[in-house]
Amino acid sequence: MRAAFVFAIAILLGLLLFLFQQLRWFGRGDWRSIPRWQKCVRASAAVIPLLIFGAVFWGFFIEPNRLVVRQETIQIDNWPPELNGLRIAVIGDIHTGGPFINDRKLKQIVELTNQQQPDLVVLLGDYMSPDSWHSHRVEPEVTAAALKNLQAPLGVYAVLGNHDWWYNGGKVRRALEDNGIRVLDDEVAEIKWRNGSFWLAGLADLWTRPQHVKETIAKVPRGATIVALTHNPDVFPDLPASVPLLLAAHTHGGQVNLPLIGTPIVPSRFGSKYTAGHLFENGHHLFVTTGIGTSILPVRFRVTPEIVILTIKF
């Protein structure tokens, strides 16, 4: 992680040097005798690097260290009235060992989630970070021991992501389950709430596991209400008609959302279609959280790390 800060500081120092040179050029000559168009050019040449400097500083040092709780409501046709108002805490892509994702941040995740008093907590994969120039591997037992303090009357359920399987999916699963978190890998679980019930269906990660979407959903009794969980939202088009809602993560919201451009890089074969937030398509609802950590580059810009409290209504 130290290398990530060295990299970011090197960029900032380069921008500062460039800005200094521009300011020197900006002040050369008799300002009163310079044509107006040249004044505009010089001013722009000074201001633009300053804006870039601020954006880089924010993206590497400020925004990745933020964490917000975001409230979302999804209205689903034919959602059972007895399940109206179900509140699910959605957490994804923690990536322990990445920039700013340490014991203190894990404690903050737990505290902020518990303050919201959700009915159910779902963890959508990628608890691990690789050993790289900007992150270091933290054993899954560390993350799981922190997450065991999550509190919800209906329990805490999880799926695994590609980074978990690239490390050791079996070890990550054992760590979570040893700390009271049930992992659903092409498995289902019935949740009873108030006077009704619904089923969670955990779908295996798309990038690293064989796909058995229809077979997994078929484990749920016919006519039952289903909330599907997975790491990668690209499975969304493959959902059977009986699944009204899929919760996913993986994309990090693109990590960088540039004004007028959007998200240049999204790890999805559908481009930016499933980048983040709520989408309704072909009778199904999809919700994708932007997650908490980072990967590839230790940067977030206009994509704030989040915990989502999702309320489902009929």
Show where each model-derived region lies.
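Conserved beta-sheet core of the metallophosphoesterase superfamily
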Residues: D178, P233-I309, F314
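Beta-strand-turn-beta hairpins that frame and shape the catalytic cleft
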Residues: Q75-A89, I181-R182, A189-A201, P221-G223, ...
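Membrane-embedded segments
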Residues: Q75, W79-R182
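Alpha-helical transmembrane signal-anchor/signal-peptide segments
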Residues: E63-N78
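Extended recognition/assembly regions associated with phosphoester-bond processing machinery
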Residues: I11-L15, Q21, F53-V56, T73-Q75, ...
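Binuclear metal-dependent hydrolase catalytic cores centered on His/Asp/Glu-rich metal-binding motifs
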Residues: R174-E187, W193-T230, D234-D238, R300-F301
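Active-site metal-binding loops of divalent metal-dependent hydrolases
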Residues: G92-H95, G125-Y127, N162-H163, E187-V188, ...
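Non-catalytic terminal accessory segments
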Residues: M1-L67
